[in-house]
């Protein structure tokens, strides 16, 4: 467990993984320099530098106002909004749309204020991602295929397991396959009126975390 913790804390390794995502998009003839991009869970921005310098515009949403100076320093040309990303997206009626939507979501239950376990992974916001799309967009988010549970977080782990089971259904959510997840999210997006043009998964931390990439098009677009 100590070795795993050390690996998880190595953000340089994670930031390198995003370059593989960008390389994949280039193989699909995606012109990154023409994309308007957004990161919905900004954090310190550690994993987004490569994205920001590759795209046309970059917007960051982050709940922690204390991180704003660091984000402004790392991303001088980005538009930075301090907000609850999930609630903002739920109420989103802005005309601003994006071509590349990054969701570097937490990997367990999380929240703010009186309810630190209010949300889980990307489950509470993925259904609203279409609000950010004009005609089509690339959506990239994290999926925990094989979660690890720290013993000292027993109550939090129980809530996390419950939320995963509710979201994914009657399967073993402790060991999910890429084919299952690809099918699951393709169907989820289809039910939201979004057609999958292409998809791929790229490891961020084996065997647990993967970046899942979906190129989506709204069904009412000809």
Where are the regions a protein language model picked out?
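A short SAM/SAH-binding and catalytic strip from SAM-dependent methyltransferases
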Residues: 100-120
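Class I SAM-dependent methyltransferase Rossmann-like catalytic core
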Residues: 1-30
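Short alpha-helix
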Residues: 175-192
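A short acidic, Gly/Pro-enriched loop at the edge of an enzyme's catalytic core
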Residues: 90-101
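Conserved class I S-adenosyl-L-methionine
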Residues: 32-43
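Conserved SAM-binding loop of SAM-dependent methyltransferases across substrates and taxa
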Residues: 44-55
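A short glycine-rich, Lys/Arg-flanked "PGG" loop and its adjoining helix->strand segment in the class I
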Residues: 119-135
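Conserved beta-strand signature within the Rossmann-like core of class I S-adenosyl-L-methionine
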Residues: 136-144
């Amino acid at each position: 467990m100590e070795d795993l913790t050390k690996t998880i804390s190595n953000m340089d390794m994670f930031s390198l993984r995003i370059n593989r995502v960008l390389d994949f998009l280039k193989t699909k003839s995606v012109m990154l320099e023409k994309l308007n991009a957004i990161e919905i869970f900004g954090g310190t921005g550690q994993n987004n530098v490569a994205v920001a310098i590759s795209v046309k515009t970059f917007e960051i949403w982050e709940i922690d106002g204390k991180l704003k100076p660091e984000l402004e320093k790392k991303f001088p040309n980005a538009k930075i909004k301090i907000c609850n990303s999930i609630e903002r997206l739920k109420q989103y009626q802005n005309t601003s749309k994006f071509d590349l939507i990054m969701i570097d979501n937490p990997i367990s239950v999380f929240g703010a204020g009186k309810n630190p376990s209010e949300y889980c992974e990307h489950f509470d916001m993925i259904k609203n991602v279409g609000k950010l799309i004009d005609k089509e967009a690339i959506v990239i988010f994290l999926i925990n295929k094989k979660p690890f549970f720290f013993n000292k977080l027993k109550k939090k782990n129980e809530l996390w397991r419950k939320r995963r089971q509710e979201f994914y259904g009657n399967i073993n959510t402790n060991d999910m396959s890429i084919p299952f997840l690809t099918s699951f999210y393709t169907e989820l997006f289809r039910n939201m009126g979004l057609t999958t043009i292409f998809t791929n998964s790229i490891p961020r931390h084996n065997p647990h975390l993967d970046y899942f990439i979906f190129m989506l098009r709204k069904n009412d677009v000809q």
